[in-house]
Amino acid sequence: MNDPILSVEQVSKSFCCATERIQILSDVSFSVPRAVKVAITGESGCGKSTLLNIIGGMEHADSGIVRVLSCDVLTLHEHALTEYRRQFLGLVFQFHHLLRDFTALENVMLPGLIAGKSYREVRARAYELLEKVRVVQRAHHFPAQMSGGERQRTAVARALINDPTLILADEPTGNLDPKNALIVQDLLFSLTEEYQKTLLIVTHDPRIASMTDYRYQLQQGSLIRI
């Protein structure tokens, strides 16, 4: 492996359930090098999304260390976490989370404008990405006017708008029919390769996992290389 872009060290997480605490993650450690695709698999409810959310600064861990390049994620306060996500991460979820009153183009542009980039630069980049994900013809359509596959491809374009270091994808094809799932998966993989991005994907689909460079399985709180 080359130098890691992501390093997770002894991360643990538990939740309170009625009268007991449920241990979801137990001393999870792994590292991810640059420009590779990594899959995390496991049964529903085993903690895959929790781990991804901790890496993304969207959930707290009970203990451990998460580093993305020089950024010590678990020590960051809220404002710094927002900057961390803006600077380092592209996020793709099972649900597209597009703003319904914004067009596809506006949805893709929004993170770039929030980051303070020029309107002209962001607009040109957004059109380029919509072309890449093959929905440029829907640039001025609202989410309700688009198919599920088109919405999710737009979400992939949005994740790339700020040229992120690391893309976190949580079951990005989980809500799609097989045909659209294959299209979204192929685009996500091809674009991360083209732009030399690191992809960490949570999936229950063994076919998708088999196409990544490194594969891990989460079992009873422990992460196992497979």
UniProtKB/Swiss-Prot annotation:
<dbReference type="InterPro" id="IPR003439">
    <property type="entry name" value="ABC_transporter-like_ATP-bd"/>
</dbReference>
<feature type="binding site">
    <location>
        <begin position="42"/>
        <end position="49"/>
    </location>
    <ligand>
        <name>ATP</name>
    </ligand>
</feature>
<keyword id="KW-0067">ATP-binding</keyword>
<keyword id="KW-1003">Cell membrane</keyword>
<dbReference type="InterPro" id="IPR003593">
    <property type="entry name" value="AAA+_ATPase"/>
</dbReference>
<feature type="domain" description="ABC transporter">
    <location>
        <begin position="6"/>
        <end position="226"/>
    </location>
</feature>
<dbReference type="Pfam" id="PF00005">
    <property type="entry name" value="ABC_tran"/>
</dbReference>
<keyword id="KW-1278">Translocase</keyword>
<keyword id="KW-0472">Membrane</keyword>
<dbReference type="GO" id="GO:0016887">
    <property type="term" value="F:ATP hydrolysis activity"/>
</dbReference>
<comment type="function">
    <text>Part of the ABC transporter complex LolCDE involved in the translocation of mature outer membrane-directed lipoproteins, from the inner membrane to the periplasmic chaperone, LolA. Responsible for the formation of the LolA-lipoprotein complex in an ATP-dependent manner.</text>
</comment>
<comment type="similarity">
    <text>Belongs to the ABC transporter superfamily. Lipoprotein translocase (TC 3.A.1.125) family.</text>
</comment>
<protein>
    <recommendedName>
        <fullName>Lipoprotein-releasing system ATP-binding protein LolD</fullName>
        <ecNumber>7.6.2.-</ecNumber>
    </recommendedName>
</protein>
<comment type="subunit">
    <text>The complex is composed of two ATP-binding proteins (LolD) and two transmembrane proteins (LolC and LolE).</text>
</comment>
<dbReference type="InterPro" id="IPR017911">
    <property type="entry name" value="MacB-like_ATP-bd"/>
</dbReference>
<dbReference type="GO" id="GO:0005886">
    <property type="term" value="C:plasma membrane"/>
</dbReference>
<dbReference type="GO" id="GO:0005524">
    <property type="term" value="F:ATP binding"/>
</dbReference>
<keyword id="KW-0997">Cell inner membrane</keyword>
<dbReference type="InterPro" id="IPR027417">
    <property type="entry name" value="P-loop_NTPase"/>
</dbReference>
<keyword id="KW-0813">Transport</keyword>
<keyword id="KW-0547">Nucleotide-binding</keyword>
